[in-house]
Curated annotation (Swiss-Prot):
One of its GO terms (molecular function) is protein homodimerization activity. GO terms for biological process: immune response. Residues 1-23 form the signal peptide. Keywords: Cytokine, Glycoprotein, Secreted, Signal. Cytokine which binds to interferon gamma receptor 1 (ifngr1). Also binds with lower affinity to interferon gamma receptor 1-like (ifngr1l). Has activating effects on macrophages and neutrophils. This is Interferon gamma. Gene3D superfamilies: 1.20.1250.10. Residues 178-198 have a biased composition (Basic residues). Glycans are attached at N31, N42, N174.
Length: 198
């Protein structure tokens, strides 16, 4: 579990670094915090670069809507993952009046907890400010997974709704094809209208 957690933190830092290269601003404090956390969640290079990223990169090469939905899911997953990391940290107990060792041993966990809370806050802010629509859609998809498949009433109602759902899905598919054709025609028309310079 610790290895997958560390991989996730590495992927978060990689994603944030990639975003920075693309022009997004990552606060210096956030970069430093991630580096501090990577020191705590230290894994070998063999584990870090084993060719199996926590989050696949393929969805990021698709259409913008797909990328936005995927990144909304990634941010939601990071919220859950960082929450799990916080739960796994040992609870720090306040030191007794004569004890100094409790203070020294609790300091790294307190720092890690503070750093994780900061990163969690930043991820939540990004998700709520820029991925509201995707969050709603993802919640709807999660709700679909919670449908009780073995319930007779649910089965009957689902059959009743199938005609409408099937028609909607078919028309969406057709609309997408039509939009592609229109875009292709517009591009071809622009090519024809644009005079070639000799």
């Amino acid at each position: 579990m610790m290895v997958s957690t560390a991989r996730a933190v590495v992927c978060l830092s990689l994603c944030l670094c990639v975003c920075q290269v693309r022009g997004s601003h990552i606060p210096a404090r956030m970069n430093k915090t991630i580096q501090n956390l990577l020191q705590h969640y230290n894994i070998s290079n063999k584990d870090r670069f084993n060719g199996k990223p926590v989050f696949p990169k393929e969805p990021l090469s698709g259409r913008m809507e797909t990328k936005m939905l995927f990144m909304g899911g990634v941010l939601e997953t990071y919220e859950k993952l960082i929450g799990q990391m916080l739960e796994q940290l040992p609870n720090t107990t306040p030191p007794t009046a004569g004890s100094r060792e409790g203070l020294n041993s609790a300091a790294p966990e307190v720092s890690v907890r503070t750093d994780l809370n900061y990163i969690l806050k930043k991820v939540q802010e990004l998700r709520t400010n820029r991925f509201k629509e995707q969050s709603k859609l993802l919640q709807g998809l999660h709700d679909l997974g919670d449908i009780k498949m073995n319930n007779f009433i649910i089965q009957s109602k689902a059959l009743w709704e199938l005609q409408w759902m099937y028609e909607e899905a078919s028309s969406l598919s057709n609309n997408t094809k039509m939009q592609r054709r229109r875009r292709r025609r517009r591009r071809q028309a622009r090519k024809v209208k644009t005079p070639t310079r000799a």
